[in-house]
Swiss-Prot record:
Belongs to the FKBP-type PPIase family. Tig subfamily. Pfam families: FKBP_C, Trigger_C, Trigger_N. SUPFAM superfamilies: FKBP-like, Triger factor/SurA peptide-binding domain-like, Trigger factor ribosome-binding domain. The lineage of its organism: Bacteria, Pseudomonadati, Verrucomicrobiota, Opitutia, Opitutales. One of its GO terms (biological process) is protein transport. This is Trigger factor.
Amino acid sequence: MNVQLNSLSDTRKSLVVSLEASEVDAAHQEVVAEFARQARIPGFRPGKAPAAIIAKRFAKDITDEFKQRVVTKAYRDGLEKQKLDVLTVVNVEPGEVAQGKPASVTITVDVRPDFKLPDYVGLPTSVAPSEATEDEVDRVIEGMRAERAEFKVAERPAAKGDYVKLAYEGKIDGKPIAEIAPDKQIYSKVPQTWEEVEGANEGVIPGLGKQLAGLKVGDKKDVEIDFPADFAAVPELAGKKAVYAAEVLEVRERVLPPLDEAFFKAQHVGNLETLKVSVRSEIKRRKEAQNRAEQRRQVTDALTAKVDFPIPESLIESETQTVLRSFIEENMRRGVPQEQFEKDKKELFEGARQAATKRVKSRLVLAKIAEAEKVEVNEQDIDAFIYREAMRTGQKPDKLVKMLTTDREQLRAVQQSIIFDKAIDFLVSKATVTTVQPKG
């Protein structure tokens, strides 16, 4: 066997593995012998049928397995001889593989880039104070009251925070929106719906709720709406000015429950002070989790910015597809139409490729740190992963255990993910921390 190594780039290599005819024939004889041991031929005891009969009866299966065996041998022995750290097999060209003839197999692979790790101990991070302020505690308690609010009919003009029942019909340049976007009735003509007056969150029609204050039952108003240029929910309306003829049918005001015994009981506390202690603790827990997540992002960004190296193209391509698929699925769940993706596919691809490149680079660096620090995956790590996934997906832990024990690829992916997480945790544990007061 002879192995010729060609460097196509810093991370892409081509192996031309040449096998002598004797090596090819040995592989063929090995395959025929295996078929002979397993074959059941009438008139012969198991494993005793002549090789010629076996070769004739199972000719196609033997040929397929023989060619695969030669390619596998070339790949395995070629990598062993060249000591390559292969990340991806890009292409395999087996050439002609036949008995009695030498064979040449060309294997194109992407290899792990060689680079020196930068200093990764003492990376700078900043966090916000984790203690809850009185204002934050009060806002949370007000939110609890809002969740239990009652909405009572108000015999007065609508004010901020009220809910207004109204009917409306929209037109653009005098043409009913029902004709422009016939499959989107909620944007055209609705006999009744509820809108919050000057609410924090936009309703279906952007800006409609901000123009209802001061209206009372029976009032009619032409409301002008400027749809954003990037209004993906209904592309036909993007960048257009619409006029909605609205009529107020009812006004209801939000009435918050008092901070009394019934309210405290519903929150599983005895009094206001106990409630504040509970809320303060939850706010602190949430802030600490946010700080931790932010530190993880900061150390990863800081680390990858300190080192530069060529990134295997196959990893970027694969991760780009993963990023794109995730983005499209998420936005389709939000109602973004397929046509919008087609329209923006160039920008989407470029953005996905940039994100993928950054993600792959950080993983390569983290993998090298994990190796340097001897980060390993233990049984407790796998158990913790199974518990988290069971909680996140609602699956039974037993099902996840079965999946990991039967799917080796999935198990390797989980182990790799855990190693990355533990490497980031290590970086955070060694980072410097500065507490910074939030702006505003």
